[in-house]
């Protein structure tokens, strides 16, 4: 989903509409397609989804969690079981990139966040899909209202 949205240019010009650093570092969140429209108030952001141009419907992505020792991910189900959490393949570490969503586990669409510190309280509840491997100082400098000029895929 994220790769497809980058290729479509969905993130180009979107705003980081939620930056939480106080009282302790938490996340920088962006990717709301509504934020491309500069007249949209920041208070209205956080609920936007990617609207698929072919279907004119919101593209919603189920929660996806991958556990060590299992061949396939589990979809659509939150886990808070400590014995399962220890087997998650991707957890919330500083620099983890994850899908933002509403309370419904299958409501992720385009919005994402970057963890500013380890966030074990989110493990098993939100899908981590990437990691900042360089440039964490850029993430640390993001301010609410900053915009993504252009998102590009980097091939190894």
For each predicted feature, which ranges?
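Cross-family detector of peptidyl-prolyl cis-trans isomerase
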Residues: 1-156
